[in-house]
Amino acid sequence: MSSQSPIYPYSYSQAAQLDPRITLARPPIDAALAPIVDAMPLPEELDIAFMRAFDLGVTIDTILEANPHITHAEHLVPKSSSDSVNLSIFSPTVSSGPLPVLFFIHGGGMISGDRLSAIPSLVDLVQEIKCVIASIEYRLSPETPAPGGAEDCYDGIVWLSTHAVSLGIDPAQIIICGSSGGAPLAAAACLMARDRQLPAVPIKAQMLLSPMLDDRCDSISDHQFEFGVPWNGLTNRTAWNHALAGQRGTENVSSYQVPARATDLSDLPQAYIDAAECEVFRDPAVVYAMNMWRCGSSCELHVWPGGVHLFDAVDNPDIPVVGAAIAAKRAWLRRMMKS
């Protein structure tokens, strides 16, 4: 679709009442969150040109200037099938021993974004929880169709495990975290690590935040939020079409490309999965958690009432649902990194 997709003409919080295309009942957006969501109108369909033009202006310099308590090191993760990919590692300036690491995989529908864009919202964890943050510059679709990005993340985990001691990282405390379009890459990397018997130490835990897990886009939440939310069904299908090179919804798709296609979720790292009540990813996230439980894997699941996709990125803990979501994530990370 052209980058000239029109701005959505209705307020998101009133879309169910105003948009005649919305015929299914659906939960309302949280009243305290609604003014913030409504103040950010977006094109009805977020195409690849629009998403790639969206630049938050985050650089290594801006991160370090705002956070003098951390240091940064850039590494190249070698790949057998392509050029190396960059891995940024943020560590405390002072540490007393090997630290846990959060291996972060950025969002952007697998078609946009970069390894630095979300770091400002994460970097205080370095000091608060005493950990290292690693963020990988995986290859994007459609230039590199799935599972290329997931393979990059898997290679990054293998490299990190192998070099953990020299990096000041505890190899038994590697937690992988994917947000939105980064979540299927995190989930796929866990499947790869299980199937390939990752060298050194397995991934300890996985964190899948507002996860983009299912290319079939046919759940109740997919239909409820086809229109009238920032990341809607139109945009979701567009991103999957790019990621899967035209194979979306077919049988020619593996679980490394689309984790929801996996039939065996046994022997996986314990998981934290969360989703917003008012987003297309809600029901696929719940089903993935249920399938983990069915297969004997452990998962903590949260569905946040009244939230939209990545609602807690507003980083306003005074909004009760935002504060609760942020607190739950951090409490889980503390438990994982201390257990």
Q: Where are the language model's segments positioned?
A:
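A glycine/proline-hinged amphipathic helix-loop "lid/cap" segment
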Residues: 1-90, 338-339
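Short beta-strand-to-loop junctions in surface cap/lid or active-site-entrance loops
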Residues: 87-98, 260-265
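Short beta-strand element of the alpha/beta-hydrolase
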Residues: 98-107
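Alpha/beta-hydrolase active-site loop signature
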Residues: 109, 138-145, 213, 308
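Short amphipathic alpha-helix adjacent to the substrate-entry channel of hydrolases
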Residues: 116-135
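Gly/Ser-rich "nucleophile elbow"/oxyanion-hole loop immediately N-terminal to the catalytic nucleophile
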Residues: 161-176
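Gly/Ala-rich beta-loop-alpha elbow adjacent to hydrolase catalytic centers
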Residues: 178, 182, 186
